[in-house]
């Protein structure tokens, strides 16, 4: 079971949030997700299997097990039944963000620095709104993108402010898979060590 999060431990805000009905659903379910010790990544209504309400979430260390998904689904379902934001029948799908994940928090860019991503901005930057390249560095206000395909006259590196992001997603590569497996292994090892420390403390 997940541990409840103290009220003073506010979750890191998302840089990219939903609009319309997706936003309303996010506002309804995010307090439940946070209370159980998870972070909301994205809410999206998809026209598949009739209608699917897709909710992506994860722990603060980036992990998300099948049991975690089941726990969140059981906690979210009754809240959605009461609030009833969707006036049609739908299938609820709770999942991890996946390896080629959406990037929605500043910490995502720090965690996955060095990997390729594609992103879209809400304003023109260097006469473009769509970019692809490596996360070369991260600053408090944005990140430096190193383009993997540089057109004539373009700068190979440019700074993209977090406030200008409309969408961002990692690109699946062998390096990303390797980094994701390593991060998952480290997170599980840290969780096991924490559990052992808790058990040792209880025995004393």
Curated annotation (Swiss-Prot):
Family, similarity comment: Belongs to the RimP family.
One biological process term in Gene Ontology: ribosomal small subunit assembly
Protein name listed in UniProt: Ribosome maturation factor RimP
SUPFAM superfamilies: YhbC-like, C-terminal domain, YhbC-like, N-terminal domain
Protein source organism: Allorhizobium ampelinum (strain ATCC BAA-846 / DSM 112012 / S4) (Agrobacterium vitis (strain S4))
Purpose: Required for maturation of 30S ribosomal subunits.
Keyword Cytoplasm on entry: yes
Subcellular location: Cytoplasm
Keyword vocabulary terms for this entry: Cytoplasm, Ribosome biogenesis
Keyword set includes Transport: no
Gene3D superfamilies in alphabetical order: RimP-like superfamily, N-terminal (3.30.300.70)
Domain of life: Bacteria
CC terms in the record's Gene Ontology section: cytosol
